[in-house]
């Protein structure tokens, strides 16, 4: 079942990649839709772990956005490059691109992008084991977050970072806050982390409950993705941030 599921997803990404490559051939080189096609194509490559084509495509998107003087296009491509390098554990390159993206977001005073990029930077520091610096960045993400967005992902990352800092009570507080409005994907990670915390604290009964809930979330995710059709996949990739 695991092999069939991943084979299905791989085929859908191949179809999406082919669709975006076809769209590039007919897209006008001086209009905004081409930037979205580039970025969605890069994301498809990234999702298939084709990192060199992803980087090449994001750079093409960046160059096109520069010619068009489209700051949001430049911002999206720059953050995309940071994401690809972060996935490959090339932290210094990732941080360099994230800092460039953050400067652009601050210049256009877009707090939604600022929140997202501060979270990106926090994750890199967290992966490096620099938990105090990660906490500073996630606090900035919360400070700059617009009042009308769902903060569940940010709360989750703050809880995870606090867990790594061994501030267990504070970690549980933020993870619990994250769970109230989280989507199924974030909930799976939240309950998995709460399971690990309770297991370490020898609260085995509570740990089992969290583990069962996490497994239920993972099962639901598998069913959702397994039944995803190509048009839904393309819609997912059309989200700009």
Stretch-by-stretch model annotation:
Residues 52-55, 59, 90-95, 102:
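A detector of tandem-repeat and repeat-rich interaction/domain scaffolds
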Residues 27-31, 64-70, 106-110, 143-150, ...:
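Short coil/turn linkers that connect adjacent helices within long alpha-helical scaffolds
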Residues 14-17, 52-55, 132, 139, ...:
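Hydrophobic positions within repeat-based interaction scaffolds
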Residues 20, 58, 62-65, 98, ...:
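Hydrophobic/aromatic packing residues within the alpha-helices of TPR/SEL1-like helical repeat arrays
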Residues 1-9, 20, 32-47, 72-87, ...:
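Conserved alpha-helical positions within TPR/SEL1-like repeat arrays
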């Amino acid at each position: 079942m695991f092999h069939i599921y991943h084979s299905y997803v791989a085929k859908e990404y191949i179809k999406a990649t082919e669709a975006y490559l076809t769209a590039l051939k007919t897209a006008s080189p001086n209009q905004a839709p081409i930037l979205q096609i580039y970025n969605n194509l890069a994301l498809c490559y990234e999702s298939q772990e084709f990192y060199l084509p992803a980087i090449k495509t994001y750079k093409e998107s960046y160059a096109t956005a520069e010619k068009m003087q489209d700051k949001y296009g430049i911002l999206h491509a720059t953050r995309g490059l940071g994401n690809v390098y972060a996935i490959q554990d090339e932290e210094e390159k990732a941080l360099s691109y994230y800092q460039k993206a953050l400067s652009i977001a601050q210049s256009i005073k877009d707090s939604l992008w600022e929140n997202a990029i501060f979270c990106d930077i926090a994750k890199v520091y967290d992966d490096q084991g620099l938990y105090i610096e990660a906490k500073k960045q996630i606090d900035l993400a919360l400070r700059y977050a617009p009042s009308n967005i769902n903060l569940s992902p940010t709360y989750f990352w703050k809880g995870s970072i606090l867990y790594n800092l061994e501030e267990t009570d504070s970690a549980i507080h933020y993870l619990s806050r994250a769970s109230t409005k989280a989507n199924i994907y974030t909930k799976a990670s939240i309950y998995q982390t709460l399971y690990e915390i309770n297991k370490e604290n020898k609260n085995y009964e509570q740990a089992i409950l969290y583990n069962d809930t996490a497994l239920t979330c993972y099962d639901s995710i598998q069913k959702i993705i397994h039944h995803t059709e190509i048009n839904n996949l393309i819609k997912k990739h059309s989200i700009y941030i």
